[in-house]
Regions:
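Active-site acidic-Proline motif in GNAT/NAT acetyltransferases
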Residues: 91-97, 125
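Short polybasic/polar patches that bind polyanions
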Residues: 95, 112, 134
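Residues forming the Rossmann-fold NAD(P)(H) cofactor-binding site
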Residues: 101
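Conserved GNAT acetyl-CoA-binding A-motif
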Residues: 111-122
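Conserved catalytic-core motifs of GNAT/GCN5-like acyltransferases
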Residues: 120-124, 134, 139-157
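Helix-turn-helix
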Residues: 129
């Protein structure tokens, strides 16, 4: 399994993975309308390009020309000396096989290289992924609700891991 930094030519791969993974990850948490709204607003190619321009680094997990997941992160997010894990998603059928750990490990290495003290993330309060993060050393530090338009909220825990 290779983990590598994606470039703009691979944003369609990231978008396609998101459209495959999100219904499984959020289908029981979010309404279909909110799911569609978020995919359209966060994973349209112009939105992904803007995220790259804002300093988000995208990683892809690939083996034998098959893509299994992706992550994005931002070192020294908002000048905090901490790295924000913005996204990490793995195809449902490969969860539990170490792909997520490999992606997270690559993010942690980048954070350490940038002399950041922690990695932090937002996770939906009803998402089972919290358990994955807890097993890997993250702790809930607070919760927040983020308005994202059209009356939708992201109801999240903020989790953090010291490096």
């Amino acid at each position: 399994m290779q983990i590598f930094v994606a470039d703009k030519s691979q944003l369609t791969v990231i978008r396609d993975l998101a459209y495959k993974i999100w219904p499984d990850a959020y289908g029981e948490i979010l309404s279909e309308a909110q799911l569609d709204y978020m995919l359209e607003n966060f994973y349209a190619i112009p939105a992904l390009e803007k995220q790259m321009e804002m300093g988000h680094v995208f990683l892809l997990a690939e083996e034998n020309d098959v893509f299994y997941g992706f992550a994005s992160y931002e070192v020294n997010c908002k000048s905090t000396g901490k790295t924000k894990l913005h996204k990490i998603y793995v195809l449902t059928e490969t969860q539990g096989k170490g792909v997520g750990k490999l992606l997270l490990s690559a993010v942690e290495k980048a954070a350490i290289k940038a002399s950041n003290s922690h990695v932090f993330l937002n996770v939906n309060r009803y998402n089972n992924a919290q358990e994955f993060y807890k097993r890997l050393g993250f702790e809930i530090i607070h919760q927040e609700d983020i308005e994202i338009g059209q009356g939708y909220l992201m109801e999240d825990f903020v989790m953090e891991k010291p490096l």
